Amino acid sequence: MKGSDALIMALRNMAATLGVYDLMEVRVFLERSCRFVQERYRAIYVDAYMSMVVDSVLDLKAGFSGTPEMDDARYSLRDALKRLDEINAPTIVGLTVLYRTYVKGEPLHPPGTPFPGGFEVEKKDGVHYCPVKDKQSDNPEALCDICIARQSPLP
């Protein structure tokens, strides 16, 4: 079994064990993580992240059969697991981050996620760009180092 197949199988097995309590736990985690986000963006972020979490779990429970993006990953799976442990991420957050990054090849902020200054995450020519990736490099709670998005070019 290839490493990518093993990862998908492990994520599917994890998703099968998740329930309502896990969703409540992730909601609390997200609200706590976003406590310093400007108020007008906070609800948007929490709702977007909750949607990603639910979609990821449902995809995995339904037997998502996409092509893993692990070969193109810029951040090792081992390092990603270490970072998730450092921030005490609930299991469901880890599942979502690993699924979106290493299986679906998607950024951790969905395209269209707004940021102060009128900027947002964009996808151009198959590449995801984030306007705040470099600015979050010193934030110990941010997972930007795991995310596949690149820093948006300066306007």
UniProtKB/Swiss-Prot annotation:
User: Which pairs of positions does the record mark as disulfide bonds?
Assistant: none
Name one matching Pfam family: DUF2115
Q: In which domain of life is the source organism classified?
A: Archaea
Q: Which HAMAP family match?
A: UPF0305
Return the similarity comment.
Answer: Belongs to the UPF0305 family.
**NCBIfam families, sorted:** PRK01022.2-5 (NF002180)
* Record protein name field: UPF0305 protein MTH_811
